[in-house]
Amino acid sequence: MPLAKRIIPCLDVDNGRVVKGVKFLDIRDAGDPVEIAKRYNQEGADEITFLDITATHEGRDTTVHTVEKIASEVFIPLTVGGGIRTVDDIRTMLNAGADKVSINSAAVFNPDFVKAASDRFGAQCIVVAIDAKKVSAEGEMPRWEIFTHGGRKPTGIDAVEWAVKMAGYGAGEILLTSMDGDGTKKGYDLGVTRAISDAVPIPVIASGGVGNLQHLVDGVTLGRADAVLAASIFHFREYTLPQAKEFMRAQGIEVRL
């Protein structure tokens, strides 16, 4: 029996509020993270991802208090990211109730951090987040580059090669966000999603650009992702999680109803 594909709502949290932007900019308010997380838990989300989108840029730590409140209300796996830079940061988040942590910029600056974190806490706890942007011109071999600091700083690192390296360093999962797609509602970048899914032996979560339920299906079928992440379509009630799961199941995709 195939493993069920997961649907993961993402809470981008800025100063204690859930927000949503377009291509990492133009932020609009979506509500209180604890209330939103509770709703998704009740609606049947498979997991929830909480990303403190200001943490790395402003050099402050993720709001432990909010994580504790969400963890006390939510009974599905919770991944927390944003400003995770040390083994102590990871321990703090796991103690606050997170099941996994997402490491982004810190992995780029110090890949051995991922290895140390995986050795200490287990690969199942460690998600490496990749913000990728297409840098090849039309007609060229497709190539995607890693950006850090909330998508503000280019690194020159090839996204597919980086994903393979991170899997080798002990990441348990890759959270792949297409910066070209983020918030645009035009669908995932299926090219980079498929390239990374095919290249690594660990699950890949597709993120960035969902505008309708067919995009979730495409992420799994065409992008070959193991899980699909979305934000605004759920936050602003364009669709509900049960609708998303029924739609995917109707297309022959195994999901937990």
From Swiss-Prot:
Keyword Protein biosynthesis: no
Record-linked SUPFAM superfamilies: Ribulose-phoshate binding barrel (SSF51366)
One MF annotation (Gene Ontology) recorded for this entry: imidazoleglycerol-phosphate synthase activity
Protein EC: 4.3.2.10
Subcellular location: Cytoplasm
Active site, UniProt feature: 12, 131
Biological process terms in GO annotation: L-histidine biosynthetic process
Predominant location: cytoplasm
Example of a GO cellular component annotation carried by this entry: cytoplasm
UniProt pathway annotation: Amino-acid biosynthesis; L-histidine biosynthesis; L-histidine from 5-phospho-alpha-D-ribose 1-diphosphate: step 5/9
Catalytic activities: 5-[(5-phospho-1-deoxy-D-ribulos-1-ylimino)methylamino]-1-(5-phospho-beta-D-ribosyl)imidazole-4-carboxamide + L-glutamine = D-erythro-1-(imidazol-4-yl)glycerol 3-phosphate + 5-amino-1-(5-phospho-beta-D-ribosyl)imidazole-4-carboxamide + L-glutamate + H(+)
Chain ranges passing through the membrane: none
Any Pfam family the entry gives: His_biosynth
UniProt keyword list: Amino-acid biosynthesis, Cytoplasm, Histidine biosynthesis, Lyase
Function per UniProt: IGPS catalyzes the conversion of PRFAR and glutamine to IGP, AICAR and glutamate. The HisF subunit catalyzes the cyclization activity that produces IGP and AICAR from PRFAR using the ammonia provided by the HisH subunit.
Subunit: Heterodimer of HisH and HisF.
Family: Belongs to the HisA/HisF family.
Protein name stated in the entry: Imidazole glycerol phosphate synthase subunit HisF
Source species of the chain: Cellvibrio japonicus (strain Ueda107) (Pseudomonas fluorescens subsp. cellulosa)
